[in-house]
Amino acid sequence: MRRFFPMAERAKLLFHNEAMDKTAMKQLISRLINHFGMTYTSNISDQLKTSGFQRATDAAISLGIDDLLTAPSKGWLVQDAEQQGSISEKHHHYGNVHAVEKLRQSIETWYATSEYLRQEMNPNFRMTDPFNPVHMMSFSGSRGSTSQVHQLVGMRGLVSDPQGQIVDLPIQSNFREGLSLTEYIISCYGARKGVVDTAVRTSDAGYLTRRLVEVVQHIVVRKTDCGTIQGIFVNLIQGRERIKNRIVLQTLIGRVLADDVYIDMRCIATRNQDIGVGLAHQLITLRAQPIYIRTPSTCKSLSRICRLCYGRSPTHGNLIELGEAVGIIAGQSIGEPGTQLTLRTFHTGGIFTGDIAEHVRAPFNGKIEFDENLVYPTRTRHGHPAFMCHNNLSITLDGQDQVHDLTISPQSLLLVQNNQYVESEQIIAEVHARTSPSKEKVRKHIYSNLEGEMHWSTNVCHAPEYVQGNVHLILRTSHLWVLSGGIHGSSAVSFPFHKDQDQVNVQLPLAKHELLPDYSVNQDRMKHKSVDSNFYGKEEQISSYSEIDRVISNEHWDSIYSTISSDNFNISGKKQRNRFFVPLRYDKERGNKGISRPNLIIKISRNGISQRNDIFAVLDDPRYRINSSGIIKYGTIKVDSIGNKENYLGDQRARGFRSKDKMKGGRFLFIPEEVHILYESSSIMVQNNSIIRAGTQITCDIESQVGGLVRIVRIKKKIEMRILPGDIYFPGEIHGISRHNGTLIPPGKILFDEFQSENWIYLQWIIPPKEKPFVPVRPVVEYGIPDGPDITAPLSLDLLREGDNLQVRVGNFLLYGDGERIQVINDISIQLVRTYLVLDWEQKDSMEEAYAYLTEVRTNGIVRNXLQISLAKYPILYMGKRKNTAGSKSMFHNKLDHANPISSNEESQLLSQHQGTIRALPNEREEGGSLMVLSPSDCSRIVLSKGSKHYDMVNRSIQDDSMMQIIELSGFLGNLHSIANRSPSSHSITYNKYYNISLKEQPIFGNSENTLRVPKWYFMDENTVVSNFGPCRNIISDLFNSNRCFPLSKFCENPFPVVSLGQLIRESVRISEDEPLPGSGQIIAVHEESLVIRLAELYLATRRATVHGHYGEIINEGDTLITLIYERFKSGDIIQGLPKVEQLSEARSINSISMNLEKSFEDWNRDMTRSLGSPWGSFISSKITMEQSRIHLVNQIQRVYRSQGVQISDKHIEIIVRQMTSKVLISGDGMADVFLPGELIELSRAQRMDRALKEATYYRTMLLGATRASLDTQSFISEAGFQETARVLARAALQGRIDWLKGLKENVILGGIVPAGTGFKQSIYHSGERNEIDPRTGK
């Protein structure tokens, strides 16, 4: 290359024998311009171009498919990544990690694989074929990049879909190998990088250039020095890290100093001295104080710029010449590189969204030791176990010959255990970055892969913001289960042909679409006939478990219609969302005639669990129900204050009770009125303050229901019309009215010294404009509330409770506050007073919850339905003896003595699609019921090996005899622990001669350990249905006797726990030594040699996750189960590239305004007042804020371009920002004779007028976008040439505006000389500004 430099010896240039890429070529040309100037540089560059073309022609490099060489390591790298993904998928299937953790690990695994392949690509080319055309072209700097070559011979990895979500299926193939059909479809998401994207980007960049040029087309260099002393500071050290030399040099080179620079009292640079390469390197090397430089944004020249504020020209490196159109150059410099910017940040390769962390590795083999008290267990972002330390943690690595001590910073993850042996280079800790980037919360929905029932643990609570919905929150990390089962249901109310636990075959009728009659049960009629005939017209026995004893369990509300037996009330159940409402209907045959009865609603949670002070029932008295709008006034009612411990909870309204809502007795008043909300003012046919009669047409389609005074008030976009019934009184003296304004007048009081009120009345003073005031005298409705609870029905509370400890407290509540306005909508009546029945008992350790059950008891042909509430630590299982009749169907059939005959029409029957066992379930969404059929495919049998210790222990325990004891357990119908419950206790089953259900953790009564024995041959399923086949099947005594007798075996001293009935087990658990589990599920039956497991899918949910649905709810495949909330790190704004530049140039809002903005301004004003001693510090802060906003805007735009590898001088952006911030908005009327409030004017113009008139001008600084700034200039010709031509010209003509033709555009439109370049001197001569600048000297 030495022959290209004829002046090389004179300049003493060194000879470099190395490859020149694009960056090195730029540096070479820059140095040539600085040393030899533009002429020699152009000559040398032309010779380089010619030499390059000649060498390329001689080489004749072509690209073929054989030149695409894939790295040999790709095979095992992809295989290793797939193995990692398989392990992660298995952990997710076992419930060890949730979906977000699995996605994170998948992303990082494939990202690392893709990056390893990228790093292996270049060494592979160098070793195999250094002169490979693909290798030379990719690193030549002319065309192509490593990213494109990586797609040709490497892999793409994970990509994003159009919504920004990562597709969990990596693209493993490259273009050389060929994409599969699935990979090709996924790759189509990146089509925005194709022809359409290029066209859109080119047009957007062109329009952006046009807008920017419109803003600054009049900016021309017309002075040498404006005399300003302002500028900006350039910090050589920013924060804790030094700025890169490249950015510092780009900022300093070509600038002019605004102040002298000193190093240790020695001046190394003076004001107005331009900064070259040597001075810039000297300032960086000496690390001088922040450099104060001049900038175009602080130039004092009006509508122009001076040479010293602009600095050196980027073209030739000298101080800018006079007459240079720097505005147009700035607009084009910013807009033209827009074609190189991407529309989004994700385009070619995979996406990595991991945490910013640094790994700490072990330097040698050894044992890790640290203090376990200083760490606590946690989970990594991949779901792996780890430890986290709050403070600095000292770790010692003890090797064979050496000891290494290191300290881990706080909030770091420790990936090893104490006293664990680690190998060299093993990761032992993960230290997070000190400055963590901003995070955003993302929601991920998890969908069900199985059809069945939803189950969860006690770590789930109801979401308070969704009181009436089906949304629940996870209290801490736990599992959610979907138990398998086939769903059968219908939109109509279905009539089941079978009962729970019946066996059905394929195509067997399950239900019939038929309405159920009203079949309430009372004490006058207790006997019912059983339907003995089958549904097929012939005698056919349906296989069932009716021959064995069964447990009637209504914990999950298996019966749809249940009845509470009482004296005067018939109760029918109705399923509504997550609560079981039992409306009470009064029996007119036994009640008082002509008296409306109150409506009692029993409110029991779906799981039957009630806490202390929970609302048990609600009584709505129809006497306190209104059908018209009005105002509530507290009269003489007595208000009782309620403490926090006795707060009444239950429904959404009760949660908001204030301390004065509970009433002891008295009277309250209701002032009726008619209210209408209107949206069209033109449709109103009456006037405000007019008096109308009942039936008057007030709008086109509304007639008034009452007569009275019309009051019309506009509230935002709506119109409220109120009709106040009553009389109108015009008083003689106005001063006497104020005493009675807005007050209630009791009966018998003299009013206005003229008449006496007979009833309660309400006075309201109205003063219409320009008319005589008057007073509407409105009628008042009086309601009385007794001191004690008024439950008119003889409700038998003794039947509803068990034991003396349980109590029912009654309280009356007024649902609305004093003076609250009530509005009736859609003619729906409103209840004013509500009576609450609240459960209460003495608080004990063993009785923390109450469990309610709707049970059906049948003895000697008599069926009784009772609601029982029992106090226990855990749910109670009720045992009952069903009558053994061969023709017995379900409990529904036993109630239908007056039902319509059942038709055998085949078309209206629901047929079974599977063979299996029926389980009747209530349908959450419909009024009818649903049937779930557990087919053989939903269950699996696990056989215990005869040689295993489990089997031997069972046989030995069966052969052993034990003593039988009898104990009595108190309680109505008997008390037994429910095995299939959601309590956290584990009920283990031990083997003896009689299988013992050992309740080891919490007995029902007392603190002793009770072991309830079930006979040897038994079957217990997940529905808590226990069936025994032994000789002791009839040992249970009369059902209505409060004392129950159960056989109890002697507790085995060394029982061998095996499994628990109803236990949910995961697939990874090993029960049998020979046969692994086929999948996760629930144990529904235990036999001597085998287990029956109901298959299930389990999902791990983290804390604060949302569960959609109820416990035991039917879930279809594809339904939303969980919504996980997790945080991910932002990589800047979502909008990047060209759209981000456009957003910044148009001054659109990026982030939301802080809610504490006013408080922040007050704090800043207080600080400025303390510093300056003046209360006007806010004005100084306003100036500083605008200067900092300019710098921030410049940095934001530069950040976008630098992230895409585009270099733009700061001076171009500063010129644009200067014009965007050059206008102010007049906000006061102090100079109303000069400027109008709301007018946009130049800041310099406002300052000159302020100095001329010696009067303060109040204005606010404005940040205008490029479009608006182009339409608010001093030249209406330039505005009309941009957009809205007709409007701009018409307004300019009406306002009589004058265009002084100072810009380039208006002179071009009118055909004049452009005031720039060679036309600059002539424009100065004609404008009469000879004294400002001398064209010969430029001063």
Swiss-Prot record:
<keyword id="KW-0150">Chloroplast</keyword>
<keyword id="KW-0240">DNA-directed RNA polymerase</keyword>
<dbReference type="InterPro" id="IPR012756">
    <property type="entry name" value="DNA-dir_RpoC2_beta_pp"/>
</dbReference>
<feature type="binding site">
    <location>
        <position position="309"/>
    </location>
    <ligand>
        <name>Zn(2+)</name>
    </ligand>
</feature>
<comment type="function">
    <text>DNA-dependent RNA polymerase catalyzes the transcription of DNA into RNA using the four ribonucleoside triphosphates as substrates.</text>
</comment>
<dbReference type="GO" id="GO:0000428">
    <property type="term" value="C:DNA-directed RNA polymerase complex"/>
</dbReference>
<comment type="subunit">
    <text>In plastids the minimal PEP RNA polymerase catalytic core is composed of four subunits: alpha, beta, beta', and beta''. When a (nuclear-encoded) sigma factor is associated with the core the holoenzyme is formed, which can initiate transcription.</text>
</comment>
<dbReference type="Pfam" id="PF04998">
    <property type="entry name" value="RNA_pol_Rpb1_5"/>
</dbReference>
<feature type="binding site">
    <location>
        <position position="306"/>
    </location>
    <ligand>
        <name>Zn(2+)</name>
    </ligand>
</feature>
<dbReference type="InterPro" id="IPR007083">
    <property type="entry name" value="RNA_pol_Rpb1_4"/>
</dbReference>
<protein>
    <recommendedName>
        <fullName>DNA-directed RNA polymerase subunit beta''</fullName>
        <ecNumber>2.7.7.6</ecNumber>
    </recommendedName>
</protein>
<dbReference type="GO" id="GO:0006351">
    <property type="term" value="P:DNA-templated transcription"/>
</dbReference>
<dbReference type="GO" id="GO:0008270">
    <property type="term" value="F:zinc ion binding"/>
</dbReference>
<keyword id="KW-0479">Metal-binding</keyword>
<dbReference type="InterPro" id="IPR007081">
    <property type="entry name" value="RNA_pol_Rpb1_5"/>
</dbReference>
<comment type="similarity">
    <text>Belongs to the RNA polymerase beta' chain family. RpoC2 subfamily.</text>
</comment>
<dbReference type="GO" id="GO:0005739">
    <property type="term" value="C:mitochondrion"/>
</dbReference>
<dbReference type="InterPro" id="IPR038120">
    <property type="entry name" value="Rpb1_funnel_sf"/>
</dbReference>
<dbReference type="GO" id="GO:0003899">
    <property type="term" value="F:DNA-directed RNA polymerase activity"/>
</dbReference>
<dbReference type="GO" id="GO:0003677">
    <property type="term" value="F:DNA binding"/>
</dbReference>
<dbReference type="InterPro" id="IPR042102">
    <property type="entry name" value="RNA_pol_Rpb1_3_sf"/>
</dbReference>
<feature type="binding site">
    <location>
        <position position="299"/>
    </location>
    <ligand>
        <name>Zn(2+)</name>
    </ligand>
</feature>
<dbReference type="InterPro" id="IPR050254">
    <property type="entry name" value="RNA_pol_beta''_euk"/>
</dbReference>
<dbReference type="GO" id="GO:0009507">
    <property type="term" value="C:chloroplast"/>
</dbReference>
<keyword id="KW-0804">Transcription</keyword>
<feature type="binding site">
    <location>
        <position position="226"/>
    </location>
    <ligand>
        <name>Zn(2+)</name>
    </ligand>
</feature>
<keyword id="KW-0548">Nucleotidyltransferase</keyword>
<keyword id="KW-0934">Plastid</keyword>
<dbReference type="Pfam" id="PF05000">
    <property type="entry name" value="RNA_pol_Rpb1_4"/>
</dbReference>
<keyword id="KW-0862">Zinc</keyword>
<keyword id="KW-0808">Transferase</keyword>
